[in-house]
Amino acid sequence: MNRLAVEIPGLSLKNPIMPASGCFGFGQEYSKYYDLNKLGAIMAKAVTPEPRLGNPTPRVAETASGMLNAIGLQNPGLEHVLAHELPFLEQFETPIIANVAGATEDDYVEVCSRIGESKAVKAIELNISCPNVKHGGIAFGTDPEVAHRLTKAVKSVASVPVYVKLSPNVADIVSIAQAIEAAGADGLTMINTLLGMRIDLKTRKPIIANGTGGLSGPAIKPVAIRMIHQVRSVSNIPIIGMGGVQTVDDVLEFLIAGADAVAVGTMNFTDPFICPKLITELPIRMDELGISSLQELKKERANQ
């Protein structure tokens, strides 16, 4: 038995580690560093129906223990992704989770109805929580009724399981999660970035041209752990956890809090080998802590 294996809807993972969407492109650049077959899965960059240029620059800023970004879902559009990006990923055994975004419900439905045409795509990550886009995005992810309606619409056309990415920029994440689960979502991914800002002392203006950006990195990990624990306490829905993962202990903390698998985001920018490193270190750390397998860890969590 593979002690690191994870089975969740649409995804048979050889290990629970994957790069988060927006931090790995469509994998081509990282494939020059290591074999992508080592990964549990790949969360690909967000896709919208039409190409998007994203927000004006500057749109990235460093912060203490993290970074701000306001990329604005820059991507080449659905047709290009289907024709040129996803075919590259089909050579690997690693399951692909396609991140889908949009400004309207029709945008999401259009992409979700077709993204499964790629044999590499085993699941969809519904990006209803991106805080950078002025029209759509944040609105879908902060209203339980709107999130429920969108999830239901996407589920009616998707050919693969649907995981919904939750925004932490809400007063009650549990009510959002419950509404999405009631709409038929196969799983959740959480959390997306927290809204933040930095000021340039010389210009007296925000460093990010868009004003605000999404805060990611180690600074948000305690928030992610808390929110995953909250949702897990009321639901057994599969969860892919993310938010500030740096170390193998972070991975285990997410799993113990209630995640079934873990995505690594910002650290890919500072260490392109972070995912394979964590995969190598995980069984060693499990031995040190007396954890026989992730399956046993899940059972232990359920009995608490």
UniProtKB/Swiss-Prot annotation:
Q: Mind telling me which GO cellular component terms the entry cites?
A: cytoplasm
Q: Name the Enzyme Commission number(s) assigned to this protein.
A: 1.3.1.14
Question: Quick one: which pathway?
Answer: Pyrimidine metabolism; UMP biosynthesis via de novo pathway; orotate from (S)-dihydroorotate (NAD(+) route): step 1/1
Could you confirm whether the keyword Electron transport appears in this record?
no
| Matches recorded under Gene3D superfamilies | Aldolase class I (3.20.20.70)
The UniProt catalytic activity note for this protein reads: (S)-dihydroorotate + NAD(+) = orotate + NADH + H(+)
Q: Which Pfam families match?
A: DHO_dh (PF01180)
Q: Which residues form the active site?
A: C130
Which PROSITE patterns does the entry mention? DHODEHASE_1, DHODEHASE_2
Binding residues annotated for FMN, in chain numbering: S21, K45, A46, N99, N127, K165, I191, G217, G243, G244, G265, T266
- Please share the entry's free-text remark on the cofactor: Binds 1 FMN per subunit.
Where does the UniProt entry say this protein principally localizes? Answer: cytoplasm
Q: What does this protein do?
A: Catalyzes the conversion of dihydroorotate to orotate with NAD(+) as electron acceptor.
Q: Which family does it belong to?
A: Belongs to the dihydroorotate dehydrogenase family. Type 1 subfamily.
Spell out the protein name for this chain: Dihydroorotate dehydrogenase B (NAD(+)), catalytic subunit
